[in-house]
């Protein structure tokens, strides 16, 4: 499953996780097994480009599949992605490229509730992406950062600085502009205006639910991970492995598997390309995790956090390039404001983390991934 969407979308005090995620990872994933360095692998430009390319690839592939005529096999899509991810990381582990712990029934029992939250997060995200354009989807994902940040304040003793609060204001403003631009375009375009507005409203509702599910997933993972000390590839392994049986049951019971619906979701002319996109979207989650580790290893967590903020621009632009997202002054303005809000937020976190920590309880946490930060917390206790 595309858990990394969470990942790169949320650089927060406690973890950064996406659209990860998210991805859900936001800063320093576990480092793969070290290999002899070379001038190519040590070049910081290459991992940054690989990370950005992986993020764009995952978003575009998901949108391609979900933008089909009345595509309604979302649980099946997530199941395929999870299976592909498990096969990929098992292969990488066998080849010595990555390492993670073996399956444990006790650890699986502790982690299962988090996998259920992840399913909710990814499913609602897929529904939102189905109804909204990539630029609008990317902009609204920023709102999850606000929910997570204040969840940190309530439950983990975090804090919100003035500059951070300003970035939140820009995020809200960009979302308002994006929604206004979408509705304005729907009203002014030809065709059934009421149907287009209804589609947008459905997308906004799914986006709201997705923001709530994502913040619940991240904050819940922060607590649960203390019981397991998981690293990032451990979380990827258990999240996808535990999700597969649940998704198989959900797709079998809740989705229409009649021959007519299968033909509608997988038209004969596009069947091969749709299946290829589904497989590639599953692989892209592995690419994101690996390139995240590569990026942090050859640069720094600070550089990585800035790359995550800057990465929102090419992801949003990919929707304008590869799909029929409207290119208007309001829509471009929303992307620009959202882009600036991400940069301001990253700068605010860097400045906050640079301040000396005083007192027993930390008021800010490093820009690291959920698994890494929570493991440190458990070691302190």
Swiss-Prot record:
The chain crosses the membrane at residues 40-60, 69-89, 110-126, 134-150, 160-181, 200-220, 233-253, 274-294, 303-323, 327-347. It holds the Pfam family UAA. GO terms for cellular component: cytoplasmic vesicle membrane; endoplasmic reticulum membrane; Golgi membrane. Keywords: Cytoplasmic vesicle, Endoplasmic reticulum, Golgi apparatus, Membrane, Sugar transport, Transmembrane, Transmembrane helix, Transport. InterPro entries: SCL35B1-4/HUT1, TPT_transporter. It is found in: Golgi apparatus membrane; Cytoplasmic vesicle membrane; Endoplasmic reticulum membrane. GO terms for molecular function: GDP-mannose transmembrane transporter activity. Residues 61-68, 127-133, 182-199, 254-273, 324-326 are lumenal. It is a multi-pass membrane protein. Residues 1-39, 90-109, 151-159, 221-232, 295-302, 348-381 are cytoplasmic. It comes from the Eukaryota. Belongs to the TPT transporter family. SLC35D subfamily. Homooligomer. Involved in the import of GDP-mannose from the cytoplasm into the Golgi lumen. This is GDP-mannose transporter.
């Amino acid at each position: 499953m595309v858990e990394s969407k969470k990942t790169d979308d949320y650089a927060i005090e406690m973890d950064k996780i996406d659209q990860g995620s998210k991805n859900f990872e936001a800063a320093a994933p576990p480092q793969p097994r070290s290999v002899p360095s070379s001038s190519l692998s040590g070049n910081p430009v290459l991992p940054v480009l690989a990370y950005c390319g992986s993020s764009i690839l995952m978003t575009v592939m998901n949108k391609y599949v979900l933008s089909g005529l009345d595509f309604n096999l979302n649980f099946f899509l997530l199941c395929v992605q999870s299976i592909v991810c498990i096969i990929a990381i098992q292969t990488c582990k066998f080849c010595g490229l990555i390492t993670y712990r073996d399956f444990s029934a006790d650890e699986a029992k502790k982690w299962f509730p988090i996998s259920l939250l992840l399913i909710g997060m990814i499913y609602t995200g897929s529904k939102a992406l189905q109804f909204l354009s990539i630029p609008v989807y990317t902009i609204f994902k920023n709102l999850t950062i606000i929910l997570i940040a204040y969840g940190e304040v309530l439950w983990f003793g975090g804090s919100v600085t003035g500059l951070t609060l300003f970035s939140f204001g820009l995020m809200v403003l960009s979302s308002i502009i994006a929604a206004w631009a979408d509705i304005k375009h729907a009203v002014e375009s030809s065709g059934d205006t009421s149907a287009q507005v209804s589609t947008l409203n459905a997308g906004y509702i799914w986006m709201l639910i997705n923001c709530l599910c994502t913040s619940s997933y991240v904050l819940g993972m922060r607590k649960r991970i203390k019981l397991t000390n998981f690293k990032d590839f451990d979380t990827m392994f258990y999240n996808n492995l535990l999700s597969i049986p649940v998704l198989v049951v959900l797709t079998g019971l809740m989705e229409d598997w009649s021959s007519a619906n299968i033909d509608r979701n997988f038209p004969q002319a596009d069947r091969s390309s749709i299946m290829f996109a589904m497989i590639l979207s599953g692989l892209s989650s592995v690419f994101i995790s690996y390139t995240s580790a590569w990026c942090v290893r050859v640069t720094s967590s600070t550089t990585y956090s800035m790359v995550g903020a800057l990465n929102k621009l090419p992801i949003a632009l990919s929707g304008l390039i590869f799909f029929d997202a409207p290119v208007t002054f309001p829509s471009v303005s929303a992307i620009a404001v959202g882009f600036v809000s991400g940069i301001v937020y990253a700068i605010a976190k860097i400045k906050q983390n640079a301040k000396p920590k005083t007192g027993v309880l930390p008021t800010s946490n490093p820009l690291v991934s959920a698994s890494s930060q929570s493991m440190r917390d458990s070691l302190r206790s």
